[in-house]
């Protein structure tokens, strides 16, 4: 139980480290130039866009994990259904085999009885 939690914490720390590394504050030269201000604005917009993109992707990942979870549950249910149907099929197959054997025995007995009756009729006619 502790290992999955530890693994998740390690993954979270790694993601947090990468996130911090990606979005480190860019030290910009402080200047009154219009170009510097435009560059700063562009960089801030770029960082904002990247953060929004990251948030969208994280949400997409969460949704995909949910879809995978649902599909795994469905696959598990389907597997359980297949197992139960297999068991039922095996039981029915055994029952069919037993009934066929019983049927064959009855037919054999009936044929013997019919043969005896035919033999009796033949002996009476002679």
From Swiss-Prot:
InterPro entries: Autophagy-rel_prot_16_dom (IPR013923). Homodimer. Part of the ATG5-ATG12/ATG16 complex. Several units of each may be present in this complex. Residues 32-109 form a coiled coil. Signal peptide: none annotated. One of its GO terms (biological process) is autophagy. GO terms for cellular component: phagophore assembly site membrane. Belongs to the ATG16 family. This is Autophagy protein 16. It is found in: Preautophagosomal structure membrane. Stabilizes the ATG5-ATG12 conjugate which is necessary for autophagy. The ATG5-ATG12/ATG16 complex is required for efficient promotion of ATG8-conjugation to phosphatidylethanolamine and ATG8 localization to the pre-autophagosomal structure (PAS). Also recruits ATG3 to the PAS. Involved in endoplasmic reticulum-specific autophagic process and is essential for the survival of cells subjected to severe ER stress. Keywords: Autophagy, Coiled coil, Membrane, Protein transport, Transport. It is a peripheral membrane protein.
């Amino acid at each position: 139980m502790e290992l999955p939690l530890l693994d998740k914490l390690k993954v979270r720390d790694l993601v947090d480290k990468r996130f911090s590394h990606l979005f480190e504050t860019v030290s910009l030269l402080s200047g009154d130039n219009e170009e510097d201000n435009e560059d700063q604005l562009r960089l801030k917009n770029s960082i904002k866009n990247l953060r929004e993109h990251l948030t969208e992707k994280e949400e997409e990942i969460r949704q995909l994990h949910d879809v995978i979870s649902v599909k795994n549950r469905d696959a598990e249910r389907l597997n359980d259904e297949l197992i139960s149907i297999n068991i039922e099929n095996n039981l029915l197959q055994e029952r069919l085999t037993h009934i066929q054997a019983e049927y064959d025995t009855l037919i054999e007995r009936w044929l013997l009885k019919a043969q005896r009756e035919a033999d009796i009729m033949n002996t009476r006619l002679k």
